Amino acid sequence: MAHKAPSVITCKAAVVWELGGPVVLEEIKVDPPKASEVRIKMLCASICHTDVLCTKGFPIPLFPRIPGHEGVGVIESVGIDAKGLKPGDIVMPLYLGECGQCLNCKTGKTNLCHVYPPPFSGLMNDGTSRMTIARTGESIYHFTSCSTWTEYAVADCNYVLKIDPKISYPHASFLSCGFTTGFGATWRETQVSKGSSVAVFGIGTVGLGVIKGAQLAGASKIIGVDVNQYKAAKGKVFGMTDFINPKDHPNKTVSELVKEITHGLGVDYCFECTGVPSLLNEALEASKFGIGTVVPIGAGGEASVAINSLILFSGRTLKCTTFGGVRTQSDLPVIIDKCLNKEIQLDELLTHEIQLENIQAAFEILKKPDCVKILINF
């Protein structure tokens, strides 16, 4: 029997039409996958702060656009060269690839692959889109390697990870960016040492990933810093030992508060997860003189940040990261296994659920103090 070629699919997607505009539900057409691509039926997706920045033109203002880069789905169809993937596979679309053969991949020191780097063009590798507005035929840009706020998406197979179908789909969605970024920053990027001290600025999903990673690494003191008192309880669930709410100490800087509970020394590692530019210098000051390491993780959308060079000359290390240094094919399955064996438990991340058609409401939910992670159901 001849194999039936996949056809165009008409479905619903969340579209941003202009810079700073609302996210609206549109009927779109999704083309079949080309040679090394797969078409994915999304099972669920989630919302990251970077998606909010996407609606504001980050990293490049390309519109109309479908946001979303966290999610999990099932492969509906594959191109003829979609290596190792088949219809029915449960997958995570990712914004990084890993060829395993380029200079960077061979060093084992970075997750930034020369062959499959983070894509920012909003288009597939051939310079075209697989998505169009159904009523007008207008081409739609996707976000990073593919967009997830849509019932169907197309991705290059090199930016897709086949996962164990036993994992909770919401948990898999949370692992496709935020939590993994924080966890990986302690594991892959800095190798947090046993008995060390850690400070985490911002206890959102990324910050909670840092806290759990630091706990599993054996850090003796894990200090969470957040102006939202609700986050204190969340932080403790993931392994935080101390909590600082700067609002309770209006006459002191964050670095002063951190030093007060570290015998005036500061911490071995400080992770800045808010993206607030002024806090980067505070993170540096909160780290130990001569040996402290600071990792900025939060996506603030700022093109540049002023750094006090005198702090750097004091022997501190500033180490930046993408996806926490986690290699998508080599490392991410290890984190998934930790979730499957309950070494990492992610139930506490999920605070709200919405249907795709209510996507605009999510932007108001994000402002609520008890919001950590919003799951989008299809």
UniProtKB/Swiss-Prot annotation:
This is Alcohol dehydrogenase 1. Belongs to the zinc-containing alcohol dehydrogenase family. Class-IV subfamily. The keyword Zinc applies. GO terms for molecular function: S-(hydroxymethyl)glutathione dehydrogenase [NAD(P)+] activity; zinc ion binding. GO terms for cellular component: cytosol. Pathway: Isoprenoid biosynthesis. One of its GO terms (biological process) is isoprenoid biosynthetic process. It comes from the Eukaryota. Its cofactor is Zn(2+). Homodimer. Its EC number is 1.1.1.-. Expressed in flowers and disk florets. Keywords: Isoprene biosynthesis, Metal-binding, NAD, Oxidoreductase, Zinc. The gene is ADH1. Zn(2+) 2 binds at residues 99, 102, 105, 113. It is an enzyme of class 1 (oxidoreductase).
